[in-house]
Structure formats: structure tokens, C-alpha cells
């Protein structure tokens, strides 16, 4: 059974039970408040969707060299984001994947809601998982929906840019034009273990494994998102008494 079939079937079943409360539950966390990580970005912690879903094992710390954008390849009609993420947890921890938690560090919903995914991601970088193998050295940001032919909604793109900016600042990643980092792969179907890899600091899943993820429409927007992230990050380089930072011809505002 494919990811889309497994998760979609589970979501359809849950909708029959949740009925009219699905949309409200997707937007209103029951067990915790959103965590404000910047002046413009709040993230719903894992407890808002999975307080009763403990990870199946420990989460190892990660050495973050780049950020990786994914999509769930599920329906773009997502009345209950919380339930969708719970269904993804069920799939990722089932015999189909055997991962300890959801693979992704963060999720972004169509309405711009940002969710913590894998346990520990808000507190510090933790190792993620990915279909096709995990080359390592990344934090995974996953868009809820299928963006093979349809571009993500404006609210989703806005929150994604804010999240990528926050993570780039947090992990000291370069965001200037053509910024890259190198690492030795831990093993994926595109980059076997031991292979030296140079990756854009904001990349798409297909750059690391043989997959269509995050969909052609989303992948085609990566350069736009990188260009929007840079000035947000570059603004943080300016300090009182110092000249604005300049890197690769891109000047901090």
C-alpha cells in the first residue's frame, strides 16, 4: 500500500467520526499553546497532535548542513491537519516504514499553520528519516498536500519561507545565492554511504533520493523561496555600529 493510499484511507475514516469538528480541531490545539520562535512565526508543538503518541524509540541529535523540502503527496483537501499528521505517524511507525516517529521535523499546512513533527525538533536538531534512505545532515520540512501540478497556497508558501528563514538562522546556514554545504552521505538511493555530497542549503527531497517529491510545482518554486529567505536572514547580520553584511553581491537590508 502506498503512502498516499494508507494515509488517505485513514483520514477518510477519521472524518466520518470527527464530522463537523474536523476543521476546528485542525486549527485549535487542545493540549498546548503555539510556541513563538520569531516575531512572525509560531509553531504548534508535537503535543498538539501527538500527546498520546509517544515515539517508538530515541531521537539522535543531528549536525545540520542543509534544509530539505518535502510534500506528503496526499489530498489537497485537508479539513483536519492534526488528524492527517496522526495518520502519517501511524504509517511511518508501521511495518511499512518501521521508523520511530514521523519522518519530518516540521509540517506546514495549507492555511500556513506550522507544526512540530518529529519529537525534539523544537528543542534542537534531531535526525530525520526519508523514503529512499536518509543521507543525513538535514532538517526536513514537509508541506501537507500534493504539489505535483498545483503550487502550494500563498499562506503555506509564506509560512514555509518564515520557517526556512528561522531554521537557516538557527543552524547558521548560508542563504546567499547558490549557497551550499558539503557532507559525507550516510546512505540514500541517490547518494550511497561514504559519498561526498555538495547540497544547496535549501534543497528538495528529489535532490537527495530518486523521488518526485516535493512535486514538480513545489520544486519549481525553490529558487523563489531561497530568494525570499535570504533578505530575512541577512537582516540579522546587521548589528549596531557595524556595516551591513554583504555576501555574494546580496546585501542585507
Task: Give the predicted meaning of each segment.
Residues 2, 10-11, 15-20, 27-61, ...:
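Basic/polar, cationic surfaces and motifs that engage anionic cell-wall
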Residues 99, 130-134:
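Short, conserved, surface-exposed binding loops centered on an aromatic residue
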Residues 80, 126-129:
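A short, polar/proline- and glycine-enriched secondary-structure boundary/capping micro-motif
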Residues 61-97:
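Active-site acidic/histidine clusters and adjacent loop/turn architecture
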Residues 101-103:
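Short secondary-structure junction motifs
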Amino acid at each position: 500500500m502506498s503512502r498516499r493510499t494508507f494515509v488517505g484511507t485513514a483520514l477518510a475514516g477519521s472524518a466520518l467520526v470527527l464530522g463537523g469538528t474536523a476543521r476546528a480541531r485542525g486549527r485549535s490545539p487542545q493540549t498546548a499553546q503555539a510556541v513563538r520562535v520569531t516575531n512572525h512565526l509560531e509553531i504548534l508543538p508535537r503535543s498538539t497532535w501527538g500527546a498520546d503518541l509517544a515515539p517508538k524509540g530515541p531521537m539522535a541529535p543531528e549536525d545540520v548542513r542543509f534544509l530539505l523540502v518535502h510534500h506528503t503527496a496526499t489530498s489537497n483537501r485537508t479539513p483536519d491537519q492534526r488528524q492527517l499528521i496522526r495518520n502519517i505517524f501511524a504509517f511511518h511507525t508501521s511495518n511499512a516504514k518501521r521508523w520511530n516517529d514521523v519522518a519530518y521535523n516540521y509540517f506546514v499546512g495549507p492555511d500556513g499553520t506550522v507544526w512540530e513533527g518529529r519529537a525534539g525538533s523544537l528543542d534542537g536538531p534531531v535526525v530525520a528519516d526519508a523514503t529512499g534512505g536518509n543521507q543525513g545532515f538535514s532538517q526536513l520540512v514537509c508541506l501537507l498536500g500534493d504539489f505535483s501540478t498545483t503550487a502550494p497556497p500563498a499562506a503555506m508558501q509564506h509560512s514555509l519561507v518564515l520557517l526556512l528563514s528561522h531554521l537557516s538562522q538557527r543552524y547558521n546556514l548560508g542563504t546567499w545565492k547558490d549557497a551550499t554545504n558539503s557532507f559525507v552521505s550516510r546512505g540514500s538511493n541517490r547518494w550511497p554511504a561514504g559519498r561526498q555530497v555538495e547540497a544547496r542549503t535549501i534543497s528538495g527531497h528529489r535532490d537527495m533520493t530518486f523521488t518526485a517529491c516535493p512535486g514538480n510545482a513545489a520544486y519549481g518554486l525553490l529558487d523563489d523561496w531561497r530568494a525570499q529567505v535570504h533578505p530575512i536572514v541577512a537582516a540579522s547580520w546587521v548589528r549596531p555600529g557595524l556595516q551591513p553584511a554583504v555576501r555574494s553581491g546580496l546585501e542585507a537590508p
